[in-house]
Amino acid sequence: MKESTQQFLALTSPGIEVLLFDEIKSLGAFNVIQKPEGVYFQASLALGYKISLWTRLATRIMLKLGEGEAKDKDELFKAASSINWPDIFKSTTTFAVDFVGYSEEIRNSQFGGLTIKDAIVDQFRDQGFERPNVDKKAPQISFQARLLRDNVTIFLDFSGRGLFQRGYREHSGAAPLKENLAAALIIRSGWLNDTSKPLVDPMCGSGTILIEAVSMAAKQAPAINRQSWGFEAWLSHDNAVWQKQLTLAIDSSEENMSNLKVKVFGIDIDERVLRTAQQNARNAQLHQYIEFTCKNTNDMDNTFGQPGTILFNPPYGERIGELPELVENFVLFGQKLKMQFKDWRIAILTANVDLLSMLKLSSFKRYKFKNGPLDCQLALYNLDAKQGAKDAINPQSDFAEEDSAFANRLKKNRKNLKGWLKSNEIEAYRLYDGDIPEYNVAIDIYGEYLVIQEYAAPKTIEEDKAKKRLQEVIYWAPKVLNIPTDKVILKTRAKQRGANQYERLEKTKQSLTINEHGALFKINLWDYLDTGLFLDHRKTRQIVAKKSQGKSLLNLFAYTGSVSVQAAVQGAASITTVDMSNTYLNWAEDNFALNKLNGHKYQFIQADCLDWLKKNVNKFDVIFIDPPTFSNSKRMEDSFDVQRDHVDLITDALKSLNRGGEIFFTNNKRNFKIDFEALDELGLTAEAMSDVTRDKDFARNKHIHNSWSIKRTAT
């Protein structure tokens, strides 16, 4: 008699669906259909058990219980009620409902799940059973409802917790690769076509790819050691049929292991992570088939025998500071491959496809995957005679320093500034500022650190070209300047409006100290787009400080108070520092403390500078004003535009200026035009200072800032 079949749904990660379709068919399922949400198939109960034990690519196996229209809450409740729940599980069994999808009437998963839960509980109560309890954290049985186009399908979570959890991984690295994705990568790499050839993971982390590969080569059932299953509390579960399938899977796996002969190698630079990989391999009882070595990938030599496959999942360079080292590693790794790994297959998974260009190799195939929330590609390369033929003797010629216009310009700029830097004892300066339009970056030096700021490419530049140029910059800058890649910080700078330039990027709370003309400044290169010190105003700080000796200074829009600090160090009589941000005002106080400056003559005021200036009754000898180009902060009643409002700002500042006093006014608005006529009506004379306040490292950029000295007109 033919066994009755039921409909199942196998879920997986995006990019794996096609492979899962093939796998489910190969395991004997009927009517296999691939859809965006997963792979549907018909199977007997025995085959459902078998597929759950043998699938490597599914994350879950779901068993269909029923379906129905669900345009609104009432229809959803009715569809859930059409299933006889006391036939599914006992009232003493805890349960949970997961809901996927939404519609105009059913707008969130919590509402949908609650409606189905109510239908289940009501049905038990109406049939005279005890009310079953919900347990969201550790239910004994789980259900999933999937809403699509006003139709809901309700499933039993047949397999239970994620099938990718094989049970051998106790610990993992910072960015673990799920086992089902690792299996998909192994299939796509082609290594399974001939497992007698070596497989190498040069950045093996916790060993997932290697353990999964050995298990696949041995034709093991991946779930035979699983301790719990979703169907165990299901009333139609047939334990005799299940035990038969489990025994068959165990026996088959043990028999296949006896014939296993593989050469698999794992390499990682992190000894701690490598110990984890070794323990995971022991847990999987596959440690004897994997040779682990602790070393840098770029120190890896080809001692693996015949050509095989290199498959790995390198870091993606998502965090500040990671990318420069990765760029260099990819360049070196590409050179290593050309020199030592002829006729090998290379497979690399990355979310940063731009890094692949640094290999200087041509991929013959790319597959799209999702690694968690990240869009990734698996790039495949065959290192045949065509790959790198022009560089067979000297692969480094791909990156010849003498051929790089950017590298040559960097060396030229460094040479031009060398004497000036030495004579002025300058620790923080700009070395490059978009000198070559194709390399649209700014490069700053802060002591032993290198900061690369990528300017957003104009729309006329192709995105791929801009990314390629940036990779060259990241590669060459630390090399030319002899700065280790772990001392390189990369930032992207688009046009900033208002307070955007002060938004937090990271939360490292790291800082370093920079000395500028005898004043010490706290610098943070990691957490914000700007560092706490505007380098282009180095000379401005000197001029204002000298003008303020023995005088009172008001510093408006003070940021981290660098002008105030320099003035205090050089002997200002009193200083009032005003800024709207508590964060930056605290930073200003840190700068004062760093220079051992304290006392009542230094005041720090957190306020909207525009509003404070209107109410201020004190007078100052020198006023420094460096407003934003535009601001509409939540703390401000009105917006501020420096072109539109600069006369009003200076008018208000004039009321706080002592007779014989001086206002230093500066801003960063390109094409700014000061209103001389309006200032003249106020009895003021403005002297352009921009050429004077630009120091040598900013001499190439005449638009970096605008500055004026404003005084009352002599009568």
UniProtKB/Swiss-Prot annotation:
Highest taxon listed in the record's lineage: Bacteria
Compartment list: Cytoplasm
Reaction it catalyzes: guanosine(2445) in 23S rRNA + S-adenosyl-L-methionine = N(2)-methylguanosine(2445) in 23S rRNA + S-adenosyl-L-homocysteine + H(+); guanosine(2069) in 23S rRNA + S-adenosyl-L-methionine = N(2)-methylguanosine(2069) in 23S rRNA + S-adenosyl-L-homocysteine + H(+)
Alphabetical list of InterPro entries matching this protein: 23SrRNA_methyltr_KL, RlmKL-like_Mtase, RlmKL-like_Mtase_CS, RlmL_1st, SAM-dep_methyl-trfase, SAM-dependent_MTases_sf, THUMP_dom
UniProt entry keywords in alphabetical sequence: Cytoplasm, Methyltransferase, RNA-binding, rRNA processing, S-adenosyl-L-methionine, Transferase
Pfam families, alphabetized: Methyltrans_SAM, RlmL_1st, THUMP, UPF0020
Gene Ontology CC, one term: cytoplasm
A GO molecular-function annotation: rRNA (guanine-N7-)-methyltransferase activity
Domain THUMP: 47-158
Family stated for the protein in its record: Belongs to the methyltransferase superfamily. RlmKL family.
Source organism phylogeny: Bacteria, Pseudomonadati, Pseudomonadota, Gammaproteobacteria, Alteromonadales
Protein name: Ribosomal RNA large subunit methyltransferase K/L
EC number, UniProt record: 2.1.1.173, 2.1.1.264
Physiological role: Specifically methylates the guanine in position 2445 (m2G2445) and the guanine in position 2069 (m7G2069) of 23S rRNA.
Name of the gene this protein is made from: rlmL
Enzyme class label: transferase
